[in-house]
Amino acid sequence: MMLVFQIALLVLVLYSLLLVVAVPVLYSSASDWSRAKNVILVGSLLWVLMVIGVGVLSFLK
């Protein structure tokens, strides 16, 4: 179970770094704002689900 937690935490950290780069780039691109808005929304919701998942795994370990 500890290995699953560590892998999930690593994925969360890497995904967070990806969002740190991608969100400002999407905000600065003036073209096709509705598509960028949807990508940011889905990416943020996925991040929240990953945080909750890591929290649950941390509680179970």
Swiss-Prot record:
Subunit field text: PSII is composed of 1 copy each of membrane proteins PsbA, PsbB, PsbC, PsbD, PsbE, PsbF, PsbH, PsbI, PsbJ, PsbK, PsbL, PsbM, PsbT, PsbX, PsbY, PsbZ, Psb30/Ycf12, peripheral proteins PsbO, CyanoQ (PsbQ), PsbU, PsbV and a large number of cofactors. It forms dimeric complexes.
Coiled coil: none
Location in the cell: Cellular thylakoid membrane
Gene: psbZ
Membrane-spanning intervals of the chain: 8-28, 41-61
Domain of life the protein comes from: Bacteria
Family as reported in the entry's similarity comment: Belongs to the PsbZ family.
A cellular component term, taken from the record's GO annotations: photosystem II reaction center
Keywords noted in UniProt: Membrane, Photosynthesis, Photosystem II, Reaction center, Thylakoid, Transmembrane, Transmembrane helix
Membrane topology value: Multi-pass membrane protein
This protein's record includes keyword Endoplasmic reticulum: no
Protein name (database record): Photosystem II reaction center protein Z
Function, as annotated: May control the interaction of photosystem II (PSII) cores with the light-harvesting antenna, regulates electron flow through the 2 photosystem reaction centers. PSII is a light-driven water plastoquinone oxidoreductase, using light energy to abstract electrons from H(2)O, generating a proton gradient subsequently used for ATP formation.
Entry's Gene Ontology BP terms: photosynthesis; photosystem II stabilization
